[in-house]
Amino acid sequence: YLFDWLVNKYGNPLRFPARSPHNDLLHALVAVARPKQGGEEVEQKRGMTLKVVLPNRSRHKPEHYHHLSKAAKIIFTRDLKRFFRLDLTAFVLNTASKGCLTLESLEQWCKSHGIRITHRDAVKRIYYRMKKQLEEQGILLPPKFPKSLQS
């Protein structure tokens, strides 16, 4: 779901807006590329690989500063997931305040954000976790969707 949302929102390769928090974080995380050595451990890749257009900063030119360590990749992925949840939260709260949050509206949000059908169940699970967290804070969202509508 994250891959679909990112490609739909920022394109492929990912090109973030000039003064975005993503570019600021990338600027902080990139390091000078190290020459590869024969004994290095090969990194295991999970999911789909995305290319990212690095910001061009006067002190950190992308030609030299384009290495993300394993820890930096984890931090950046966590940040992207956080922005996905913020986008979903904004939609849920806006739609719920109008009183029209339904399974169809959640499906429509997924469709409009380029999330494939195979990943929509994951988005629903995120919604239910978010709903539970909001209820713990006293914000009530619509009840669970009827099982007859879930597919």
Across the structure, where does each feature detected by a protein language model lie?
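Residues in the recognition helix of alpha-helical DNA-binding motifs
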Residues: 126, 130
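Short, charged amphipathic recognition helices of the HTH superfamily
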Residues: 93-113, 134
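Short Lys/Arg-enriched helix C-cap and helix-to-coil transition segments
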Residues: 134-150
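Short, basic interhelical loop/turn and adjoining N-cap
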Residues: 108-125
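Positively charged, polyanion-binding regions of nucleic-acid-associated proteins
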Residues: 77-98
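Long, low-complexity interaction regions most often at the N-terminus
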Residues: 1-68
